[in-house]
Structures are given as structure tokens and as C-alpha cells.
A protein has these predicted regions:
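Acidic, glycine-centered active-site loop in nucleotide-sugar glycosyltransferases
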Residues: 45, 59-61, 71-88, 113
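The C-terminal output helix
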Residues: 138-140
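Hydrophobic anchor at the start of a short beta-strand
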Residues: 11, 64, 84
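Nucleotide-activated donor-binding/catalytic signature segment of Leloir-type glycosyltransferases, i.e.
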Residues: 1-28
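A charged, aromatic-enriched C-terminal amphipathic alpha-helix characteristic of glycosyltransferases
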Residues: 88-91, 95, 105-136
């Protein structure tokens, strides 16, 4: 399996890398990939969780591709926000990759959508203000 992931032509397997190195790798990437398990047990366990890796991918500057079961909360979020190329059926993977190969502007479009999503929904100052407003509203 590692040979498939690390063919040194199209894909590179880095193993464990530091957060600083991850940023450098994202800078050199066309796609930031977020993958969740399709195993039923793991899918059910993680279906309500929102991985911090999603935010990392959205901030990467690359187009985001999410390959996850459709019951996953993070996948639903990315799909609703149209912030990522979303694949919930592994049978769609090859067709999606061929579409990207034939229309590379898809990656530019989704990199922009990821950036717009980060600005709209993941601004720490804006989120802090919203939380403070909620506390004030419910404290009265």
C-alpha cells in the first residue's frame, strides 16, 4: 500500500511531519485531502465529530477534497458550504479525478471557495464576538 501512496510521481507519502512542515507541504500542493474511514463502526463513532484537519485543509490555500461517508458532520459541512470537492462514494473517485484532470480550473475554483469559507465561518474575532453576543443575549 505504501508504494501506491508514495510513487514519487503523483503522490508523496511523508509519514509524520511537524506542523511547520505541513504548512510547507500545503504550499506545494494542488489539493489538500481530508479522508474519513468508510468502515461502518468508525463512521458511526465519528459521524458527529468535526475534525480540526478540515480547518487546516481550508486554510491551506489549496483546493480541498473530502473523501468521507455522507453521514460525517465535517463532510456535510463542506458539502453545504460548497467549500470542497466532496466524494462520499468511492466509485466516484476516478470520475472526479478525471474531471479535474480535464478541467484543472476546478482546483482554482475550489481553492477560492475554501478561502471564502474560512473568511466567512472561521474568523476568530468574528466568532468571539458572536459568542459574546450570545452570552449577553441569554444572560438578560
Amino acid at each position: 500500500e505504501k508504494e501506491i501512496l508514495d510513487n514519487q510521481i503523483y503522490t508523496y507519502y511523508h509519514g509524520l511531519i511537524s506542523p511547520e512542515q505541513l504548512i510547507k507541504e500545503y504550499d506545494n500542493s494542488s489539493i489538500a485531502l481530508h479522508v474519513e474511514s468508510f468502515d461502518l463502526k468508525n463512521s458511526l463513532i465519528t459521524r458527529l465529530s468535526f475534525s480540526t484537519k478540515i480547518t487546516d485543509c481550508l486554510q491551506s490555500g489549496a483546493a480541498v477534497m473530502a473523501i468521507c461517508p455522507e453521514i460525517n458532520a465535517g463532510f456535510k459541512y463542506l458539502l453545504e458550504e460548497d467549500a470542497a470537492i466532496c466524494i462520499s462514494n468511492l466509485d466516484e473517485l476516478e470520475t472526479t479525478l478525471r474531471n479535474i484532470f480535464n478541467e484543472p480550473e476546478i482546483l482554482t475554483d475550489y481553492a477560492l471557495k475554501a478561502r471564502e469559507c474560512i473568511i466567512k465561518n472561521h474568523n476568530p474575532l468574528k466568532n468571539k464576538e458572536m459568542i459574546a453576543d450570545d452570552f449577553h443575549k441569554y444572560a438578560q
